[in-house]
Curated annotation (Swiss-Prot):
EC number, UniProt record: 2.7.8.7
Keywords attached to this entry: Cytoplasm, Fatty acid biosynthesis, Fatty acid metabolism, Lipid biosynthesis, Lipid metabolism, Magnesium, Metal-binding, Transferase
Gene: acpS
Pfam families referenced in this protein's UniProt entry, alphabetically: ACPS
Record carries keyword Metal-binding: yes
Top-level taxon in the UniProt lineage: Bacteria
Organism: Mycoplasmoides gallisepticum (strain R(low / passage 15 / clone 2)) (Mycoplasma gallisepticum)
Cofactor: Mg(2+)
UniProt-recorded name of the protein: Holo-[acyl-carrier-protein] synthase
Major place of residence: cytoplasm
Gene Ontology CC: cytoplasm
GO molecular function: holo-[acyl-carrier-protein] synthase activity; magnesium ion binding
Length: 111
């Protein structure tokens, strides 16, 4: 049963100014921070941050709740983004971007 749908749209270039250590620690889990450190190129770093921000916002909207961003870990597995909460809720995630706009969608399903 679907329990919620969340959508978020961001401008990728806005993350150019948001690369402080404080912002990174508030947005990313430790594992995500380690992945971020391996991303080469400013544009790719902006996209990495925009994807995580937008997916986490969409997830919170789908769940109709708000928590710390670091409570959610986004992983890219076989080309698809995933986030596990618990065995009772499955999250279906999707992103798309064109130019400087990125849209993320999350569907929360009770299983």
């Amino acid at each position: 049963m679907i329990i919620g749908v969340g959508i978020d749209v961001v401008s990728i270039d806005r993350f150019q100014a948001k690369k402080s250590d404080e912002f990174i620690k508030k947005l990313l889990t430790e594992h995500e921070q380690n992945k971020y450190k391996t991303v080469i190129g400013e544009s790719n770093q902006n996209i990495f941050l925009a994807i995580r921000w937008s997916l986490k916002e969409a997830i919170f909207k789908a769940l109709k709740t708000w928590d710390e961003f670091t409570q959610l870990e986004i992983r890219k597995i076989h080309g698809a983004y995933e986030c596990s909460l618990n065995e009772k809720i499955k999250l279906h995630l999707s992103i798309s971007h064109e130019g400087q706009r990125l849209v993320a969608m999350a569907v929360a399903e009770r299983i």
